[in-house]
UniProtKB/Swiss-Prot annotation:
The TFIID basal transcription factor complex plays a major role in the initiation of RNA polymerase II (Pol II)-dependent transcription. TFIID recognizes and binds promoters via its subunit tbp, a TATA-box-binding protein, and promotes assembly of the pre-initiation complex (PIC). The TFIID complex consists of tbp and TBP-associated factors (TAFs). Residues 59-131 form the Histone-fold domain. It comes from Xenopus laevis (African clawed frog). This is Transcription initiation factor TFIID subunit 12. One of its GO terms (cellular component) is transcription factor TFIID complex. The gene is taf12.
Amino acid sequence: MNQFGASALINLSSFSSSTTPSPTSVAVKQEPAMANSTPVGKVPVPTAGGGRASPEANQVLSKKKLHDLVREVDPNEQLDEDVEEMLLQIADDFIESVVSAACQLARHRKSNTLEVKDVQLHLERQWNMWIPGFGSEEIRPYKKACTTEAHKQRMALIKKTQKK
C-alpha cells in the first residue's frame, strides 16, 4: 500500500524488450491493502488526434512542475528554454529506462504483472535510490562479492606494471 491508497501494477502480457505498451491504454491492477486477487482493468491514456499520444501525455514531468521544483530550490532562478527541454528529456529517459528494467525483472520472475518490488529492486541496485513509503522487507540486502586473495595479487601486479 502506498501513500495514494493502492499500489498500481501493470500487466506485461504484451511487453517485449523492444516494444512498449500501446499508448491508448495501459492495464493496471489495483491492489487493496490486504487482498491480492483484484482483477486487472484497462486505464485509458489521453491521446491527441490520429490515435497518437500527445507529447504532454508522454512526459512524466511537465514544464509547470519543473518550474515549481526550481522555485523550491531557488525562487529567483530562471531556466533557459534549452535547459528546460534537456531536463524534461532526461527525466523521460530515466523513467523509460527504469520501467524497461523493471519489466525485465518482472519477466525474469515469470510474471505478467509489473509490481512495485520490481521498480524498487532496480532503483535500489542500479541507482542507490529508495521509494519512500515502501518497505524493503522482501528485498534481501545486496552484498558485493568478496575479492579473493588471488584477485588482489593480480590487481597489484597490474598496478605495478602500469607504474613502469
